[in-house]
Amino acid sequence: MSDLARLLDEVAGEFAPDPRTSVFEVAVEGDSLVGQTTEAEAVEALLALLTERGTTLRDEVVRLPDPMLAGRRCALVCSPYGAVHARPAMAATQVSQYVLGARLDVLTMRDGWLRVRGEDGYIGWMHPGYLEVGEEDWAREWETGSAGESLLSLDAALHDEAGRTIARLPWGARVIRDQPRSIRLPDGRRGALGAGELVPMARRADRFPARGDSVVRSAREWLGVPYLWGGVTQAGVDCSGLVQSILWMHGIALPRDADMQVRVGAPLAPVPGELLPGDLAFFAEQERVTHVALSMGEGLVIHSALANGEVAVDDLRGDRDVERRLASLLVSARRVLPD
């Protein structure tokens, strides 16, 4: 590795250590520093280090969000959920999803795709067919509910005047009621509640208190949902998506992946019988956290695992092979709910 390549790696490691939440794609071409980054300070630090070494380069690095996106730097998900991909291609791995009504920051465009950052800080590529794109004021109006009453979906469906379904709203989707019997979607479509339930955002804390028993009750509503890598809805969910989606409804914001979630909250001894309802249990393979489960108390956990193929309950003190293996991988626990 050349000295310059090593320097680029060092700066990336300091300022943008996790490509899931930051971008540092910078290289040297001729006498110019080119590429793009979300971390403006990283470029300044790199240029200073190069100057110390007697190297002067033209700074042509694009700071994200791309200035060329003026007026199109925000997006709202307007389909039931939108897939987030690792690369700008449908064949690329799905790394996450965002549900209808979620507000996203648009960082850049490539090959007709949008690189976005969600409310949880996660960065990935989304096809614009999932999204409505606009300005900051427009997105903030939606996000704050200033255009009407902000509502959260519990698997609701909207119908038109003829009773036909016009939208299926997954758990946690956000819509606006700006007329007595009319619900507005981010793309302007309207309908009336035809099935399921819509909970006012202002009543979320009452309906979904940050208590262990209430969190476990919510989690039970997900039993039997199929396992899906990158999923966050009851159409399919992975381990960290399950935990993130449930706790978000209870007012607890968590990062997207298990190895990120393990750094949140108060550390606990990873002893199955001592975990309370709502605590998080983390499991590792080859010394890396790869799985998270939600404690139900008394050694029981509810989780989405490929070994079960769905969201299921397992006993960390049980005798089944899958339960013994799971217990052997338990390495950490965290309490994210208030005492």
Question: Language model features by range: what are they?
Answer:
Residues 92, 98, 169, 274-275:
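Short, well-ordered loop/turn sites that connect or cap secondary structure elements
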Residues 133, 205, 268-271, 296-339:
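Aromatic- and glycine-rich peptidoglycan recognition patches
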Residues 102, 173, 278-279:
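Structural motif
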Residues 87-93, 156-165, 262-271:
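Short alpha-helix capping/helix-loop boundary micro-motifs
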Residues 29-37:
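Short, aliphatic-rich beta-strand segments
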Residues 219, 231-250:
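Active-site nucleophilic cysteine motif
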Residues 252-310, 316:
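...with weaker cross-activation on analogous glycine-rich loops/strands in unrelated enzymes
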Residues 20-24, 44-69, 73, 89, ...:
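Boundary regions of SH3-family modules and the immediately adjacent low-complexity/disordered segments
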